[in-house]
């Protein structure tokens, strides 16, 4: 039996409302990857649609956790960062990558900071510049079009997009440092939405689209990125991994919509895990 590959996941924890670590940990673990976590904050719920939530910042614990792991000689096959709440946390993750990235370690950064043409209310445009610095350390980044525009210093353009714009954006993002870029929210019309992937080593661009489902579904970016990383760590190409992640995320959304679940609660990723494992070739 081969040893399990190991990923470090650096995200916040929302006790209720499936997103961030409560999505990344089960999905990546189910795909046969051992997951070690550095929690950046603990919240009673995520912040999208809930009020009165509790929040405990864990910035002060992040470096001591990393230092303890370093003293134990722990190594990682992947490092995966998601929502980071401050420039200080970006600095900590940057140092973590410097300390733990080895020749074959895959670094995936989800620059979660903006959507719908706006920065999240807790951030300003300087944060986008700092996130760009972190993305330069990554092998793979998974921005949406708002995050892509802000990292490139451009104005946000809403969908629909042309292939020329999508492919230009992919290549320009790769020039920031990462050799692989997966853009989410790709839509050429109102009927389908998905991702576009670019691998600089092969100059290959690929698309993965699924039928549009009306509504705003919390946590789907975390579901997508977690499935993408899990597939990639299981030996699939970037294009194959993105296609699987789009299909899986779409299934999660459809099940949630059909069940009539409160959309604030997150999507039903659990029932789709067997199909995800079959698609990935794990079972």
Predicted regions and their residues:
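Conserved N-terminal subdomain of the carbohydrate kinase-like
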Residues: 2-109, 113-121, 270-274, 278-281
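Short pre-catalytic strand/loop immediately N-terminal to key active-site residues, enriched for Gly-Thr
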Residues: 15, 205-218
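Short Asp/Glu-rich motifs
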Residues: 47-48, 88, 154, 192, ...
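Conserved phosphate/ATP/ADP-binding segment of small-molecule kinases
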Residues: 122-205, 213, 236-239
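Short, small-residue alpha-helix embedded
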Residues: 150, 215-238, 242
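Charged C-terminal helix
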Residues: 239-283
């Amino acid at each position: 039996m081969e040893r399990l590959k190991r990923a470090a996941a650096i995200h916040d924890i929302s006790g209720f409302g499936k997103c961030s670590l409560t999505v990344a940990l089960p999905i990546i673990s189910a795909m046969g990857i051992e997951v070690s976590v550095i929690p950046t904050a603990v919240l009673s719920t995520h912040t999208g649609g809930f009020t009165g939530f509790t929040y405990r910042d864990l910035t002060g614990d992040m470096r001591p956790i990393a230092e303890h792991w370093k003293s134990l000689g722990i190594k990682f096959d992947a490092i995966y960062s998601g929502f980071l709440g401050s420039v200080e946390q970006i600095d900590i993750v940057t140092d973590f990558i410097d300390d733990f990235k080895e020749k074959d370690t895959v670094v995936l950064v989800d620059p979660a900071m903006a959507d719908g043409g706006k920065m999240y209310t807790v951030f300003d445009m300087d944060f986008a510049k700092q996130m760009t610095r972190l993305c330069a350390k990554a092998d793979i980044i998974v921005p949406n079009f708002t995050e892509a525009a802000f990292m490139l210093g451009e104005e946000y353009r809403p969908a629909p997009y042309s292939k020329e714009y999508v492919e230009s954006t992919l290549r320009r993002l790769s020039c920031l440092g990462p050799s692989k870029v997966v853009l989410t929210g790709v839509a050429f019309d109102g009927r389908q939405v998905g991702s576009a992937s670019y691998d600089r080593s092969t100059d290959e661009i690929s698309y993965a689209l699924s039928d549009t489902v009306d509504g705003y579904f919390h946590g789907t970016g975390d579901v997508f990125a977690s499935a993408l990383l899990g597939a990639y760590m299981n030996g699939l190409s970037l294009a194959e991994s993105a296609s699987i992640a789009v299909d899986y995320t779409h299934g999660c959304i459809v099940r949630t919509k059909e069940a009539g679940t409160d959309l604030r609660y997150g999507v039903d990723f659990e029932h789709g895990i067997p199909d995800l494992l079959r698609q990935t070739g794990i079972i």
